[in-house]
């Protein structure tokens, strides 16, 4: 594992408290509000003309939950993140044609959201551990691109 035992504990302890639906919906909504041109990937999700549309779009909330649940799978596979995300990398590259830069952007937004939802637990050490995790997840999802 690229993570020390201490980093793994920090990640697992915080993750046990995460509300995946709330944080996932929040993270994906933020991505689409901060970077509105990213909405083109989700045009089939219905109305997203305004920020309020994005915030109240059930399909965005649902997909955000799915995305964060997938991020949570990395937490369960800290010793083999790349292997675990091989299929998703291929899918995003071949089928969805998602720019791999989005994985880094969303990873950073997930970190912001975790900090907002868990301000007391989100110490600098925990932040650093999750930043490392987000880097590894983004790299694993980008494998097919290079």
Curated annotation (Swiss-Prot):
GO terms for biological process: hydrogen peroxide catabolic process. GO terms for cellular component: blood microparticle; haptoglobin-hemoglobin complex; hemoglobin complex. Red blood cells. CDD domains: Hb-beta-like (cd08925). Heme b binds at residues 63, 92. GO terms for molecular function: haptoglobin binding; heme binding; metal ion binding; organic acid binding; oxygen binding; oxygen carrier activity; peroxidase activity. Keywords: Heme, Iron, Metal-binding, Oxygen transport, Transport. InterPro entries: Globin, Globin-like_sf, Globin/Proto, Hemoglobin_b, Hemoglobin_oxygen_transport. Pfam families: Globin. Residues 2-146 form the Globin domain. Heterotetramer of two alpha chains and two beta chains. When oxygenated in vitro, exists virtually only in polymeric form. When deoxygenated, forms tetramers, octamers and larger polymers. Displays a pronounced Bohr effect despite the lack of the His at position 146 conserved in the beta subunit in most other vertebrates. Shows chloride-dependent sensitivity to organophosphates like ATP and 2,3-diphosphoglycerate (DPG) but not to inositol hexaphosphate (IHP). Binds molecular CO(2), not bicarbonate as reported for other crocodilians. Belongs to the globin family. Involved in oxygen transport from the lung to the various peripheral tissues. This is Hemoglobin subunit beta. It comes from Paleosuchus palpebrosus.
